[in-house]
């Protein structure tokens, strides 16, 4: 288990300055989007063609806000989302790029420890323990409190499942990153 998780972090040999631990549902989409006709589409290899439902729906406005944050602060992305499960880093980069997000900034995943009873905070902690010497600081962006893991190097910012990544949360993160 430990070896498998170390391989999943994909952090060996990467010199990182700042990290965004990024969840997807409740961050780049909103709970009410589940009923949106925009969630249905007709030709996407990430969705099951038989049900024509986009399992990876992204609100373009929220994605633009995340993209601007990543670009403005030169952040690298580590995915904590369940969307990462069963995908390679390259496949997930393509998924992000196809959804208005900077896939080129994705450098890896937290390990999937859910089957071992790990919370998202535990997965983030595991990642940080195995890559700490390379990380200057980090931000965790998630709609669930179970991802809350703060240290002197980083901070958790919670979004709302129903509102996603709002301007208010964006302002708080920007103030945090500017004052470090």
Residue spans for each PLM region:
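Non-catalytic pre-domain segments flanking phosphatase-related domains
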Residues: 1-22, 32
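Short, flexible coil/linker elements and helix-boundary hinge sites characteristic
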Residues: 10-13, 74, 179
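A generic local structural motif
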Residues: 7, 64, 125-127
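Short coil/turn segments at beta-strand junctions that form active-site/ligand-binding loops
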Residues: 16-18, 73-75, 134-137, 154
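Short, exposed beta-strand "edge-strand" segments with a Pro/Gly-rich flavor and a Y/T-containing core
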Residues: 15-16, 83-87, 161-165
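Alpha-helical substrate-recognition element adjacent to the catalytic core
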Residues: 19-114
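C-terminal cap/substrate-recognition subdomain and adjoining C-terminal extension
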Residues: 90-180
